[in-house]
């Protein structure tokens, strides 16, 4: 009986945590914005169109959403190239440390074209 109670309690906590960390809803756009558990933007990638953004969003997880408007308060930037298809993407980050950490190890098919700098 205690096991069932614990499982029910853990399930409820997981559901509440998921709801609390949902980014604001809005119309889709070409800005893929990642947010922390408090809703603050930590990084953003500006894709050439909504379809490209939504493909990446499907792989990115729950902390990222394609938005029509870019996030405010991001202080650093870097330019990345996605191969294929050879698309340049502007990345924006909460600060230079976040930018340098994120771009120090990129997944296969992603290259750093322009290093981190203040916006």
Label every model-predicted segment.
Residues 117-119:
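Short, solvent-exposed mixed-charge patches
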Residues 20-22:
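Bacterial signal peptide processing site
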Residues 24-38, 74-84:
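A short beta-strand micro-motif
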Residues 1-8:
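Bacterial N-terminal signal peptides that target proteins for export
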Residues 47-63, 93-114:
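A short, charged, amphipathic alpha-helix used as a generic interaction element across diverse proteins
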Residues 15-18:
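C-terminal motif of bacterial Sec signal peptides marking the signal peptidase cleavage site
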Residues 39-46, 85-90:
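Second-shell loop/turn segments in exported
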Residues 70-104:
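Short, solvent-exposed interaction modules
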């Amino acid at each position: 009986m205690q096991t069932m109670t614990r499982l029910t309690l853990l399930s409820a906590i997981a559901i509440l945590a998921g709801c609390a960390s949902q980014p604001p809803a809005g119309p889709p756009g070409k800005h893929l914005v990642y947010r922390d558990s408090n809703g603050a933007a930590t990084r953003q990638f500006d894709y050439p169109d909504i379809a490209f953004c939504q493909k990446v969003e499907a792989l990115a997880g729950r902390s990222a959403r394609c938005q029509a408007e870019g996030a405010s308060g991001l202080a650093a930037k870097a330019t990345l190239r996605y191969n294929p298809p050879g698309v340049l993407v502007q990345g924006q980050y909460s600060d230079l440390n976040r930018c340098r950490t994120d771009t120090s190890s990129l997944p296969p098919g992603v290259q750093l074209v322009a290093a981190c700098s203040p916006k």
